[in-house]
Structures are given as C-alpha cells and as structure tokens.
Curated annotation (Swiss-Prot):
Belongs to the UPF0297 family. This is UPF0297 protein SMU_2079c. InterPro entries: IreB (IPR009309). It comes from the Bacteria. Disulfide bonds: none annotated. Pfam families: IreB.
Amino acid sequence: MGFTDETVRFNLDDGNKKEISETLTHVYRSLEEKGYNPINQIVGYVLSGDPAYVPRYNDARNQIRKYERDEIVEELVRYYLQGNGIDLK
C-alpha cells in the first residue's frame, strides 16, 4: 500500500476517550505497583505493540489491549495539548 499526498481524517469515538484515560491510569498504577518505570513501559508498548511491556497484574495487559495503539496516541496528544492551553474543537 502506497502513501498518498492527500490529508486523511482520523476520528476517535468520544465514548472511548474517557475509557482510554481510565485504562492508562490503571495500567500506570499497575506498572508502578510492580516496580516498573510506567512511562518507559507504556511508551515501549505504544511504539512496538508488544503486550509484554505491560504485566498481566491487575488485568492491565488485557485492559490496554482493548484499544488500538493509534487511539491511545490520539488520547495522549489530546491530553497534552489541552494541558498546554490549546483549545481543541
């Protein structure tokens, strides 16, 4: 599949936003409880797609795998921009 020079749209269901946020919080806390660096582990998962970066502890692995990685990235970008005063419409 080739790349196109045209801009394409990507839309995330609004209902998923809160669920993704809650899931990331749950995964972060589970990683922290197990003694891992949560940021490094979540980044490793998002970049590679390898679920081994997230432990089964507290069902964290199954929880994060409910979402596509691009949905997670979108929520992270949205949260970052809003936290820096960008008014997202």
